[in-house]
Amino acid sequence: MDKKLLNIIACPICNKKLNFDLIRKELICEFDSVAFPIKDGIPILLRDSSYPIKKR
């Protein structure tokens, strides 16, 4: 994931910073405990595409 992109995108639910999970290849919002998939290198930042994750 491009670091420049990570600096400008935000969670579409709460507008907080997203983190990239290198192992799972997804974007994580720690505040909302949700993940957003990345398909073909494109982050899918739609509320309906998010899924819950366990608090880490």
Curated annotation (Swiss-Prot):
GO terms for cellular component: cytosol. InterPro entries: Trm112-like (IPR005651). PANTHER family: PROTEIN PREY, MITOCHONDRIAL, ZGC:162634. HAMAP family: UPF0434. Belongs to the UPF0434 family. This is UPF0434 protein WIGBR2520.
